């Protein structure tokens, strides 16, 4: 590497020039893609190592437990960079999601030392953390001797930092006093509306402005467009049916899952606000949803949007992102920061967060922390967002990155605007408590019964609240 080449890449690593200018100047120097990538990694390693000893755990080997996911793919693709920068070897096991969480629970509950770092959803930490299975990452984040000065914890979106931290006391606010940082945010999903621009335009329709408008348009499409229906949402007997579009709308209409008045949890999903919203939700499904809604998971919702079978979905925005390329409807997908309640001022999307957590049983915690810093750091997440599919990025600096904006505007028009409109109100709206999966699965089952007409909305939500109160009491969570 010549001095001119080294200076060029060091200037980029110091953020004195942008990626586009770097690539243009590298090309003028006659550097190919492989050489450019190698020199860029070397420059970034030099910049990161300037004020922090990344080689302190040289010679150690880490083992990761990963879900099969684009976030994991982005890290694996660039893993050689981490190994060269730290001298730490990394091995990993990857499992599909239908068995992944069973693998995590088995490893942690047995206090296995097999894995040092693993992927986790934020909701799962409500079980893993209080059980003593996770490291509270505050001990690393708040210790300048353990954390690189360039890491910039504050750059991670504040709602994500708080949504992955909790005191462990049922009902206490996420990110509140005494909260432990159980995971590092790694990527997330905003539950919003994605829509088929071509299908709506053919009916002379604009994207829906609120839930009543969505219901009307979904009903019209289900009636007028052969082989298509209006709105796709999840409906299987699973916690995931509640956490996506349903809870986002439920919150926007003023609903809450629990009250914490008096320091005790009380189920209140059967409030007037909760009942009124749920009636609208079921009206939407009956008039404009899929005929076999009770079988719908992430996959059916996603596939129908990409196949042109559904006109709209109210689910993770990254579904719309992934369906925009390589599908029948590629190029036809639009995105909207959706405010369901006509009287609400802004969206309140519930979110799913994939994070990285450290096993409390790892004997290589300092090395594990170096990996977690690298994997959730600005450079790697920018790589994931611009060169792979690590969206939605958890760092504001990545959303501000010129190359990422160019990528979005070129192939995913409207996605950046959807994020900017929804992100301020995007967070986890569930009340943290250890029976989360029991509660939400029972809630989904109750929705199915209401949908089928086996019970009214009023009675169904009242029965659900009574049942959950009993479960909390039996578990010793309430008196």
Named regions from a protein language model:
Residues 75, 142-146, 151, 155, ...:
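C-terminal lobe and pocket-closing loops
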Residues 77-78, 242-253, 276-373:
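Extracytoplasmic/periplasmic substrate-binding proteins
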Residues 167-186, 191, 215-266, 310:
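Extracytoplasmic/periplasmic solute-binding protein
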């Amino acid at each position: 590497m010549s001095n001119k080449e080294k200076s060029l890449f060091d200037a980029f690593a110091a953020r004195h020039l942008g990626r586009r200018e770097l690539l243009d100047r590298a090309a003028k120097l006659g550097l190919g893609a492989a050489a450019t990538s190698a020199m860029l990694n070397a420059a970034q390693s030099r910049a990161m190592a300037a004020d922090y000893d990344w080689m302190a755990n040289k010679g150690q080997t880490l083992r990761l437990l990963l879900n099969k996911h684009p976030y994991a793919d982005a890290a694996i693709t660039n893993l050689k960079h981490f190994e060269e920068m730290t001298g730490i070897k990394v091995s990993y096991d990857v499992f599909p999601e239908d068995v992944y969480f069973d693998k995590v629970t088995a490893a942690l509950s047995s206090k296995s030392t097999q894995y040092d770092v693993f992927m986790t959803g934020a909701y799962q930490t409500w079980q893993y953390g209080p059980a003593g299975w996770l490291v509270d990452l505050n001990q690393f984040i708040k210790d300048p001797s353990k954390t690189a000065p360039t890491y910039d914890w504050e750059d991670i979106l504040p709602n994500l930092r708080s949504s992955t931290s909790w005191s462990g006391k049922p009902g206490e606010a996420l990110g509140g006093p005494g909260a432990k940082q159980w995971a590092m945010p790694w990527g997330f999903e905003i539950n919003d509306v994605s829509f088929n621009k071509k299908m709506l335009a053919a009916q002379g329709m604009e994207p829906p402005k609120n839930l009543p408008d969505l219901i009307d348009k979904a009903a019209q499409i289900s009636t007028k467009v052969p082989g298509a229906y209006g709105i796709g949402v999840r409906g299987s007997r699973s916690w995931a049916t509640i956490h996506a579009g349903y809870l986002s709308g439920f919150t926007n209409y003023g609903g809450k899952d629990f009250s914490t008045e008096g320091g005790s949890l009380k189920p209140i999903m059967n409030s007037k606000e909760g009942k009124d919203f749920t009636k609208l939700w079921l009206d939407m499904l009956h008039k404009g949803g899929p005929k076999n809604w009770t079988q719908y998971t992430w996959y059916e919702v996603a596939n129908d949007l990409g196949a042109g079978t559904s006109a709209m979905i109210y689910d993770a925005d990254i579904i719309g992102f992934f369906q925009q390329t390589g599908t029948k409807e590629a190029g036809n997908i639009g995105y909207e920061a959706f405010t369901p309640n006509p009287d609400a001022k802004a969206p309140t999307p519930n979110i799913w967060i994939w994070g990285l957590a450290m096993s409390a049983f790892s004997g290589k915690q300092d090395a594990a922390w170096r990996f977690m810093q690298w994997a959730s750091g600005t450079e790697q997440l920018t790589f994931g967002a611009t060169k792979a599919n690590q969206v939605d990025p958890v760092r504001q600096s990545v959303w501000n990155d010129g190359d990422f904006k160019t990528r979005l505007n070129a192939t995913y028009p409207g996605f950046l605007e959807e994020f900017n409109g929804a992100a301020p109100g995007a967070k986890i709206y569930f009340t943290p408590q250890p029976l989360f999966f029991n509660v939400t699965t029972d809630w989904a089952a109750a929705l199915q019964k209401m949908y089928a007409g086996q019970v009214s909305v009023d009675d169904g939500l009242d029965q659900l609240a009574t049942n959950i109160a009993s479960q909390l009491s039996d578990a010793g969570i309430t008196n």
